């Protein structure tokens, strides 16, 4: 007769009791001919609008739209990747327009979303944290 090791039994029970956290899923769509990517949580939401083909003219028309439950009118949002990379985005009325954001910061934000993993959007009074799968085909620059 084979007796299960107590250490193995405890390890198996511990592994079964550890909850598996599902990744936050981007909702992908198209609005006015532009690709959109949205994430929502109980604490707020974020929507990225891309214009890789310059549909509405030669200037960039991308935007990051944010809504925080505890900070209704932030003037700055920082996108923080788990790696420590950060992008600072000036916000007006919940919108960070690509044309108004430093190109390097916009690129860092897009790279963070493209890479997936854990990241946060932070204001002076609130934050949203997500963990997503990579978006390797994200074209938003």
Annotate the PLM regions:
Residues 73-78, 117:
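Short beta-strand/loop motifs in extracellular/secreted proteins, especially
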Residues 81-141:
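Internal interaction segment
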